[in-house]
């Protein structure tokens, strides 16, 4: 069964173009289930599944242990361990995806997860920040330094286009057309889309790309955003920089790069952009995903109304 886990992870990586973050989560979730099955089947613990390991140890974990009862017991055990509902939901989702892969490749004849459902999650609306907070964040990088210029450019691009952090780090030189102010994005599942950027974002990009210090450190001739060693920035390093600027700006709350994506989507909607256009710009596969911003916009309107009304 462990070889099937690895085949599934290879499929996610090579065919479905899953991000390293997604692959890490799948490894964590499948390892958790594997440990449970080994314990449930009274088998000796084996090496954890690691997609990036050169050694892939096969074990005697039989598919006969992968039953509906086993999956139910596993979910029950997670609940008894007081795991968060979102964690339980994600782990069940990983097992279901693995099961569907096995059915598709005729490794399994029946789906052990078919009638099993995870816990219901409360609908959480994304919390955008205000125009004023966006301006405060933008003004934080030190523009006297090359790295500050790069980081201002990053922030401007996040807000200009609502890009995911993984889409920002994967940007290459040939993805940007300065004549039309358009950029080509490789989104989830290798789906490409072409979206506009603001004139201001284009100006910051040109200034950053033409900076002599950037040319001096560049080792990666393709990547747009480089670290101080001249290689492509990672999602983790951008996350760290983002948190640094939050501290320096004095802004409080749970604000992440993804918050900026939620923010510009909400601002687009408030300024009259239709949902289909927002869906295309954000790269949502379903309009239902985009519709959540109508609820966010209404929530903000109600909040503003209550705060501004004399009887509020």
From Swiss-Prot:
Primary role: Site-specific tyrosine recombinase, which acts by catalyzing the cutting and rejoining of the recombining DNA molecules. The XerC-XerD complex is essential to convert dimers of the bacterial chromosome into monomers to permit their segregation at cell division. It also contributes to the segregational stability of plasmids.
CDD domains in alphabetical order: INT_XerDC_C
Per the record, the similarity remark reads: Belongs to the 'phage' integrase family. XerC subfamily.
Assembly notes: Forms a cyclic heterotetrameric complex composed of two molecules of XerC and two molecules of XerD.
Gene Ontology BP terms: cell division; chromosome segregation; DNA transposition
Instruction: Report which superkingdom the organism of origin falls in.
Output: Bacteria
| Alphabetized UniProt keyword annotations | Cell cycle, Cell division, Chromosome partition, Cytoplasm, DNA integration, DNA recombination, DNA-binding
* List of catalytic residues: 164, 188, 258, 261, 284, 293
Record InterPro entries: CB, DNA_brk_join_enz, Integrase-like_cat_sf, Integrase_catalytic, Integrase_recombinase_N, Integrase_SAM-like_N, Tyrosine_recombinase_XerC/XerD, Tyrosine_recombinase_XerCD
Name of the protein in its database record: Tyrosine recombinase XerC
Q: Which classification does the entry list for the species?
A: Bacteria, Pseudomonadati, Chlamydiota, Chlamydiia, Chlamydiales
Any one Gene Ontology MF annotation carried by this entry is:
DNA binding
Residue stretches making up the Core-binding (CB) domain: 1-103
- Entries under PROSITE patterns matching the protein: CB (PS51900), TYR_RECOMBINASE (PS51898)
Q: Name one GO cellular component term.
A: cytoplasm
Q: Which gene encodes it?
A: xerC
- Which PANTHER family does the annotation name? PHAGE INTEGRASE-RELATED, TYROSINE RECOMBINASE XERC
The record places domain Tyr recombinase at 124-306
Q: Where in the cell is it found?
A: Cytoplasm
Pfam families tied to this protein: Phage_int_SAM_1, Phage_integrase
């Amino acid at each position: 069964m462990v070889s099937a886990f690895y085949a599934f992870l290879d499929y996610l990586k090579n065919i479905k173009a899953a991000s390293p973050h997604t692959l890490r989560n799948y490894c964590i979730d499948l390892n958790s289930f594997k440990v449970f099955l080994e314990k449930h089947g009274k088998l000796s613990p084996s090496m954890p599944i690691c997609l990036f390991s050169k050694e892939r140890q096969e074990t005697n974990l039989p598919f006969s242990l992968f039953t509906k009862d086993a999956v139910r017991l596993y979910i029950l055990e997670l609940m008894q361990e007081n795991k968060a509902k979102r964690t339980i939901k994600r782990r069940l989702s990983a097992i279901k995806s693995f099961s569907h892969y096995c059915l598709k490749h005729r490794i399994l004849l029946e789906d052990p997860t078919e009638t099993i459902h995870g816990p219901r999650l409360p609908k959480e609306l994304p919390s955008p920040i205000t125009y004023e907070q966006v301006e405060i964040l933008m003004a934080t990088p030190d523009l006297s330094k090359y790295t500050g210029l790069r980081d201002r450019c990053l922030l401007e691009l996040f807000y200009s286009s609502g890009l995911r952090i993984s889409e920002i780090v994967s940007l290459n030189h040939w993805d940007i057309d300065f004549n039309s102010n358009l950029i080509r994005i490789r989104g989830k599942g290798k789906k490409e889309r072409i979206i506009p950027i603001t004139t201001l974002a284009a100006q910051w990009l040109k200034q950053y790309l033409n900076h002599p210090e950037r040319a001096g450190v560049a080792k990666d001739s393709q990547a747009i955003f480089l670290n101080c060693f001249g290689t492509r920035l990672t999602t983790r390093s951008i996350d760290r920089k983002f948190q640094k600027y939050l501290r320096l700006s004095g802004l409080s709350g749970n604000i992440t790069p993804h918050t900026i994506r939620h923010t510009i989507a909400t601002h687009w909607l408030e300024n009259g952009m239709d949902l289909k256009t927002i869906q295309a710009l954000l790269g949502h596969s379903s309009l239902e995903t985009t519709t959540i911003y109508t609820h966010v916009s209404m929530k903000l309107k109600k909040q503003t109304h209550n705060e501004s009304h004399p009887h509020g």
